[in-house]
Every structure is written in C-alpha cells, then in structure tokens.
C-alpha cells in the first residue's frame, strides 16, 4: 500500500473508532493479528482487534465526552506512520481502579503505526500518562506533597 493509503487508515481509526465511537469499524482498519502496546493498558501486549476495541472502550466509558484531535499524520519509511494527537475529556466514568473524579483532562501523545496490506498490524501508543494522573488528582504535581 502507498504511504497515503496507510495514512488514510490511521485517520480512519481516529475518526471512526475513537471520535465516531464505532468500535466495529476497527475490523476494517486493523489486521486480525494486531499487536497493541500502550503504557497503561489493561491487557499489556494486547493482540488482535479486540485489544484495541477494549482499550478504546475503556476511554469512552471513563471519558464519555472524549475527543481525539489529530494534529499531524506523517508517513515514515515503508510501512510506518506516526500520528501526533491530543486526547481531551471529562472523567465521568470509572477507569480501571480509578473512580470518576469529574476532572477535565488533556493528554498529548504520539502513536507509531505499522501497516501491512492496507491494515494496521501494530500500534505503539506513547502518551503522557503521568500528566493524566496528575490532572485526575491521583499523583501530585511536582513540588506538592501528597496528602
């Protein structure tokens, strides 16, 4: 597939699965052998389309108003695509082990995608989990003692 087609697959993920809340659309975007890496994953090293569906679903439930804003989608060498994005939402639902706080959260991220035959086969999320935990009040910001 061309670099533009790979970038289109990545954009579809953010538009249809994340912002469109259509988890079934993942079946057309991701390879069944998907390998998913994410720092706070409930299933580290998740495999298969259900891994990404489960992860996105957790954020939809925890942040019902969540929106993913994609700032850049860049094609790298061969089958690689990088997306720079921001996630925003209000923590109104439970995250695993974290009851709702009502806090508004903004998180910056980069995701590295690997595409094969027009589908995403690997996804590595690198996002500021510490900042999210600070915004939720779970971890104190630098210079503030925990209570």
Label every PLM stretch briefly:
Residues 1-147:
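C-terminal and inter-domain tail/linker signature
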